[in-house]
C-alpha cells in the first residue's frame, strides 16, 4: 500500500472532534492555517490537543466504511448470511464467492485512517508531555496504551482479511517520507502487535468512572486495560500461544468477578446478574421472572452492559450512525435488511427440530425473525424491550415475543464481550488438550445454560452433558465451533473463526464444509474455489496495486502461481 496516498485523511481529518468519548474542541487546530498549509507541530502544545486527536481516533472507528467492512469481512462469506432485500451488487458478488479486486469492499483506506491517527498520537503526545505540566507521565502512558490498542485492533482486522498487509507504526506527516511499503507477512504483523501491546498493556486505564456513574458507558466505549488484555488473548489464540491466551482471559475474568462483588456490596442484591459456576453473567430471565430477553436488552438493546468489554459507541443525533445495522440488518421501516439468515439456522427451531439451536435457546429468537419467505436478522435492530417466554415453547407463536425496532441508527457495535473471553479460553484449553477438556466444557456449558434461561433456582442443571464431548478432541472442537456460532451470530466473527481454524488445520476442508452449507446452487464450484488456501482471504484493491508497485496481489487472484497456506 502507498500510505502516502492516505495522507489526505490525516491532513483533512485527523484532528476533527471525536464523538465517542470527550468533546474537546478542535477549532484551535483548524483555525491555524489553511488546510493545505497545515503545520502539525503548531497544534501539539497542551493536553487538550492530545485528547482531541485521541477522540478523532474513535470518530474514525465509527465511520460507516469501517463499520460496514467489519461486518462484511468478518461475517459475509460465512454460513451465517445470504441475500436479503435490495442487496447491492458488490455485496451480492461476495455472497456468490465472486471476489474481484475491483470490489469496493476490498478498500482498506478507512482502517489506515484510524491507524495513522493513532500513529500520530504516539509520535506527538510525548512532545506535549515535555512542555505541558498538566499532562502527566502517567497520562501519557495511558494515552499511548489507548491508541496502541485501537491501532492493533485495526491491523488485526486487516491481517485476518487480507493476510499480509503494509505495516508501519510511523505517522504519515512529512512529504519527504517514503511510505510506499510492501506487505508484511501475517505472522510478522501478529508478533509485532503482541510485542507492542505487551509493552503498554498495564498502562491502560482500568476504569474511567464508577459503575454507578451516568458516564460509566465510557468504561466499555473507550479502551481499558481489560480490552487490551482481551485483544492480547485473541492475538495469542491466533498465534497458537494458548498459555498466554488463557493467562489474559483469566485476568479479565478475575476483574469481572471483582466488579460483580463490588456491585453486590453496593446494591445488596442483583436480580439480573448471577454466578454461573463462579463466573458472573447477565441472565436471560431475571430471578423471579418468567420472561426472557434480559440479556439481549442489556447487551444489544441498551448497550454498554455489565458484560461489555469494548463496543463502538453510537448515539442518535451525534453525527455518527451505525449504517451497517440499519441498512444490512433492518430498521423500523424494513424488517428485512439487505442481508438475511439462511434457512438452516432458524427452520423448525421452536419445534425443537433445528440442527444448531435447541427450542429453548433464547439466542435464536433474539437474532432471527421469520419475514415472509426469508429470515430477517434482528440482532442489534431491536431496542431494549425484547420479551418472550420459552417455558412451553411449541412454535413461534407460543413465545409471545414482544419487541420494538430502532428508529435511529444508534446500535452500538460490540467488538468484545465477556462471552469472547470465556470462549477464547475454552478454545485455548481444547487446543492444549488432556485435562483441559473438562474445564473447556464447563466454560462452554455456562454460556449454554444462560442461553437456555437457567436461573439461580436451577443452576445445578446442565444443558449439555460432559460425557457426550469431553472424551474426544473432535467432539470438543465441534461443540466449541457450534457454541461460538450460536453465541456470536451476526457479530462479525464467524468467517474469521473459520479462517483461524483453517490456518490451524493447515487445510480449508473444515472451512469449506461449514461455509458451503448456505448454498443451494453452484456448491461444487464454490468448494473448488475455497480449496485454494489463498482464496480464503480478500484480494488487494485494484487502486492500491496501481499506486504501490511493491504490493503483490494474492496468488489466488493471480492464476498460475503456487498456492500454499500460511499457518
Predicted regions and their residues:
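A short, exposed helix-loop element centered on a Lys and neighboring polar residues
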Residues: 27-71
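TPR-repeat structural position
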Residues: 242, 435-437
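Conserved, well-structured interaction surfaces
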Residues: 51-65, 86-162, 178-191, 197-207, ...
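Elongated scaffold/linker segments in the mid-to-C-terminal portions of large proteins
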Residues: 45-49, 54, 58, 65, ...
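Bacterial Sec-dependent N-terminal signal peptides
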Residues: 19-46, 193, 233, 426, ...
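Short, surface-exposed recognition loops and adjoining beta-strand edges that mediate ligand/DNA contacts
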Residues: 41, 68-85, 168, 206-226, ...
